[in-house]
Amino acid sequence: MVRVIIKGGVWKNTEDEILKAAISKYGKNQWARISSLLVRKTPKQCKARWYEWLDPSIKKTEWSKEEDEKLLHLAKLMPTQWRTIAPLVGRTANHCLERYQKLLDQAEAQDNQATSSSLGLIGTGEAVPSADDVRRLRPGEIDPDPETKPARPDPIDMDEDEKEMLSEARARLANTQGKKAKRKARERALEQSRRLAMLQKRRELKAAGITIKQKPKKGSVDYNADVPFEKKPLPGFYDTSAETSKSYKAPIGKTLQELNNRNAGPEDATKSKRQREAEEKNKQAKQPIAGPSDEHIRKLKEADQITKRRKLNLPAAQVGQDELEAIVKIGLAGERARFLVQDGSSDATDSLLENYSALDSAKATRTPQLAAHEDSVMREANHLRLISSMQTPLLGDVNVDLQSSKSSGIQTPGSFVPQTPNPLLTPGLRNGQTPASASDSRLHADTSTPQRTPLRDNLGLNVDDSFQAGHETPRELKRARSLAQSHLRQSLSSLPAPKNDFDIVVDEQDVELQANSSSRLDNEPAMSEEDAAERDARLARQAAEEEARSEARRSQVVRRNLPRPAQVDLSRLHNQIDSRYRDRVELLVARETAQLLHHDANVHPIAGGKHPEPEAVQFDTLSDTSLITARELMRKELAEQLGFPGANQEALKRMVAASLNDDEEGMQRLEDALKQQWYEARNNKSQLVEQLEVTRAKMARIASQAAKGEKMLTKVLGGYQARSVALLNSTKEQFKALQEAAISRETFEYLGRGEQCGKADRLDSLRKEVESLARRESMAQTAYKLLAEERSTLQEHCEMLEMELLMRQAESLNEANLSA
């Protein structure tokens, strides 16, 4: 019984590969020829398989939310028109239908789940089968659309039919030659066999003594008689002028194109230009006219799909890099100022200074949780499911109650884009918000996010002007005013109760000021006579105050009894300052310093110095107010340089001491300078002994450092030293080799001069030998010519004798025939 093959069924991986290879060879129009390679598939099935699954332009990725929304919207506008919807969505019609059914099933499942959970209809019986279980194929059923499903993998042991189909397809697809190529090959084989037959025939006739003269072909060459491609030399001597003028230098600095076009002239350039133009015309003529190719269409589809992707739109930077750095510097300066103020302030004023650190506020800042929004895809799918199950309007039934949606019937449902609130955004009204809505939003301030968060206002000093936006009518203004008053009453009612248990602390400066004022009152003429003891005490107090003020007017060096020179030559210092400083400000500062040194050395001399007359010293004495102002300016300048503007004197002392303690090297240099420079020749012997010990300790320390440095350098530079010795030995060997080469060169030069002297004699002898050989060759050529002429004469004579012999034999034969 003949086996009947029913074409169709599940596609296998082997069949897919054969189909793709056949389409690459035969194209997408010869489906009958393509299906002839597949035993179990028809042309229609092959075409459907390609356009539903194997086409590279088919999109098989996961469905995005935008694609789902577009699919549901188009299904509402064009129900059951999947061939029209498919190119708009960018998927195949079958994929669109499957996705549509899946979305409806999901919406129905959610609806059923919500209904059952609300009514509590959960029993112990079997659950209702899902949509996937209903659509899943049962045993014995046949898939109606196998072309849209993935291929079945190949088994390890294939059937004989599949192996035969695969081998036949491989053989047919490997045959890349067409009918014309086969015909040409067949004609070449026939021509070769005909030529061999003719050669065999001539060979046999020649062996039989029959010579057939072959007619030469036109334009052919007889390789037995002629030398192919022979070029006979011209008579005479060869012209070598072209060789002597030819340059044999290496083509250094020239490109390959210059070398190839070295002999090209203007005619060659014109010819190449015409050839390029002809090639361009041929390419344009060979291009297809009937529309773009399939590859071009596929690229356009991919570009269309790429353009449909959502772009990443980020807002522009509201604060630049420079502004961020400035904000950081301001914050650090504020923190330092707060630290300095807290260091010297009292507890009574601590409550007036708030902490505006951005780090603490950033730690507490969190992105607010977004409210759960409804899934628009499921909502639209549920709408379509209800619409599809709705009865005809002729029955008069109630319409389906659809949920409110942002989308109308003519646009795709909008999507919700979650955004992080921006606290740096300028506060104001929303787009399209009316003043009334703005005022209403103020009423619900406890449930909504305010328009602006007051920054750096912990004491509530700034006035909130957010109420003034949008109040245009008198009614709104009155309403806003009443709200502000009620808010103020609530704020005042929340204030703590007043406290009266305060302690009065009197500062010592206030006591001194009070004493000064009392002393000024004492200076006025009194009504009664002053007591002598009180007068003496007042005078002593005034003298002490004047002494304190005089002590304050002295320089820091004198007050602290710091080392200073015993004698100062002011004119010499001025000359050195004028020659060293060019800047006017530095020059003035240096001159003032020299003047102050000279004043201190003369007015407040040290032990061992001279005591000149104070009247000879010219120095402008400043007032107490000027000194206080100058010291305050110095304090501010030093605080700004240290990065702590507004710091007090004690804080500056601590910071300067800390910086000097960190600079150990500078302190060591200062101590060494003080130990070496600030001493007098009249010091006692113990000081010199101490200085000697210090110097010896310094020498020992320097010697140990030098030994360590030498050891370290030996370790570091040992390799370099060994390398230097090796290079020195190599240099000596090379120099020796150079000397030997120079001696060899001189030797060969001497031999060359000797060869130059004997070259002429050898050339003469060789020339004579060549001349004798030439004479002998000419004589031999003459003898050869005579012998060749004699040989030709003898050959002609022999031929004549042979002809005469043949004639006599022919005559004898004729006579014999006649006599017979």
Curated annotation (Swiss-Prot):
Give the Basic and acidic residues compositional bias ranges: 132-155, 268-283, 534-554
Keywords of this entry: Coiled coil, Cytoplasm, DNA-binding, mRNA processing, mRNA splicing, Nucleus, Repeat, Spliceosome
The family assignment reads: Belongs to the CEF1 family.
Species the sequence originates in: Mycosarcoma maydis
Q: Tell me which GO cellular component terms the UniProt record holds.
A: cytosol; nucleolar peripheral inclusion body; post-mRNA release spliceosomal complex; Prp19 complex; spliceosomal complex
- DNA-binding region extent: 31-54, 82-104
Q: Where in the cell is it found?
A: Cytoplasm; Nucleus
Official protein name in the record: Pre-mRNA-splicing factor CEF1
Annotated HTH myb-type domain residues? 3-58, 59-108
Gene for this chain:
CEF1
Supply the InterPro entries for this chain. Answer: CDC5L/Cef1, Cdc5p/Cef1_C, Homeodomain-like_sf, Myb_dom, SANT/Myb, SANT_CDC5L_II
